[in-house]
């Protein structure tokens, strides 16, 4: 249920930015569809203060950087609009939004109104039950993924550096990692939040962990982009999470992903861990039960009876086999629960990132005054 609530908050984030097709913020002459132009115009309104780009929000920073590289003015609405249009196509694809349609569900006014008839507050969202395209949600999730991709800058020997300007976003990622320490352990047992405060760089091992966390969060953003566009086959904007980045869930549930750094697995150690997990499962919930001591059973005088009262080799083999099976079942169940918790946590962080995408210092101050 928590995961569903997190996903719902991601889908409704776009409703914070209602879109009107009649917007005349600019006469953008790009090849974008009418619907995408309407989204861009609405985002420009949210990103500007008194006709000037607010560079204090995550998206504002990224757009300002792109505009500076192109020699564009942050004081021109036309330049801001054209640059945002270009940025969207660079990050989401050349043909993104080229044939976006208007949702048919909901009220009679605006774009895909949520049954209100006013066309305000629903953004570009269409009938959620039909899974039709929600262009605003696609844009926000795609740009949110792009912000994550730009957080780390490669440096020497596999390490990376980051900017203090991106600290609000970095701290959300670090908190996600601290909340899921089993998947993202630190070498010294400290916190990722403190790691960010030490300096503005990560070594190769820290970078690998951080990128793994970014991949998990990015996958949530990509999944939401795919859901908004009606794509249900996975993929989307999120980087596919490789087995090497998340590790083997059957092993990680007990040992953590660090164990996957060793290519040569100690089979004996693994079997021992599975047996130990099987014993824990049995002791907590019955199952195989306590090994039977033959000394408490009648021998019946048969040759097959074990006169020493010890468990026979055959019984011991069956017992170990049963423990291994129970250990594997319990480990896989734990891994499934861990994976669900991780994805739920990632969905929450993704929703926070989308909600903060346009939140700059200036409009936060204005909202507080209002």
Swiss-Prot record:
Sequence ranges of Polar residues compositional bias: 221-231, 292-313
Source domain of life: Bacteria
Entry's Gene Ontology BP terms: monoatomic ion transmembrane transport; symbiont-mediated perturbation of host programmed cell death
Sequence repeats: from-to residues: 235-240, 286-291
Keyword Membrane: yes
Keyword Ion transport included in the entry's annotation: yes
Range of residues in the leader sequence: none
Subcellular location field: Secreted; Host cell membrane
Result of changing residue 265 to A: In strain: ICMP 2844
Region of interest (2 X 7 AA repeats of G-G-G-L-G-[ST]-P), residue spans: 235-291
Residue numbers spanned by region Disordered: 221-257, 282-314
Listed InterPro entries: HrpN/Z, T3SS_HrpZ
Alphabetized UniProt keyword annotations: Host cell membrane, Host membrane, Hypersensitive response elicitation, Ion channel, Ion transport, Membrane, Repeat, Secreted, Transport, Virulence
GO CC annotations, alphabetized: extracellular region; host cell plasma membrane; membrane
Entry domain remark: The glycine-rich region is characteristic of harpins.
Role noted for this protein: Harpins are proteins able to elicit hypersensitive response (HR) in non-host plants and are required for pathogenicity in host plants. HrpZ forms ion-conducting pores permeable for cations. Such pore-forming activity may allow nutrient release and/or delivery of virulence factors during bacterial colonization of host plants.
Subunit composition and interactions: Homomultimeric.
Family the entry assigns: Belongs to the harpin HrpZ family.
Protein name as it appears in the record: Harpin HrpZ
């Amino acid at each position: 249920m928590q995961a569903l609530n997190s996903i719902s908050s991601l889908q409704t984030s776009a409703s914070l930015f209602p879109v009107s097709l009649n917007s005349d913020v600019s006469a953008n002459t790009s090849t974008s569809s009418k619907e995408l132009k309407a989204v861009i115009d609405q985002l420009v309104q949210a990103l500007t203060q008194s006709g000037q780009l607010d560079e204090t929000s995550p998206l504002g920073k990224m757009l300002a950087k792109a505009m500076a590289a192109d020699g564009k003015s942050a004081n021109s609405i036309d330049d801001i609009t054209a640059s945002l249009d270009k940025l969207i196509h660079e990050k989401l694809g050349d043909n993104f939004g080229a044939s976006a349609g208007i949702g048919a569900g909901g009220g009679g006014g605006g774009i895909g109104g949520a049954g209100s008839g006013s066309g305000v507050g629903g953004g570009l969202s269409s009938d959620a039950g039909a899974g039709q395209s929600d262009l605003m949600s696609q844009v926000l999730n795609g740009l949110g993924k792009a912000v994550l991709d730009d957080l780390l800058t490669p440096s020497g020997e596999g390490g990376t550096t980051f900017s203090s300007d991106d600290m609000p976003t970095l701290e959300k990622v670090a908190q996600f990692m601290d909340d899921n320490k089993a998947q993202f352990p630190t070498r010294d047992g400290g916190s990722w939040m403190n790691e960010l405060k030490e300096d503005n760089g990560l070594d190769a091992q820290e970078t690998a962990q951080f990128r793994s966390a970014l991949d998990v969060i990015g996958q949530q953003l990509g999944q939401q982009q795919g859901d908004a566009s009606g794509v249900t086959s996975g993929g989307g904007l999120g980087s596919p999470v490789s087995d090497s980045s998340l590790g083997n869930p059957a092993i990680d549930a007990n040992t953590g992903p660090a164990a996957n750094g060793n290519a040569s697995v100690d089979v004996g150690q693994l079997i021992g861990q599975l047996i130990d997990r099987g014993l824990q499962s049995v002791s907590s919930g019955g199952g195989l039960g306590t090994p039977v001591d033959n000394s408490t059973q009648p021998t019946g005088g048969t040759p097959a009876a074990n006169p020493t009262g010890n468990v026979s080799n055959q019984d011991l083999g069956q017992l170990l086999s049963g423990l291994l099976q129970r250990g594997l079942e319990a480990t896989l169940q734990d891994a499934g629960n861990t994976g669900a918790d991780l994805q739920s946590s990632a969905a929450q962080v993704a929703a926070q990132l989308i909600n903060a995408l346009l939140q700059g210092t200036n409009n936060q101050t204005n909202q507080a005054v209002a």
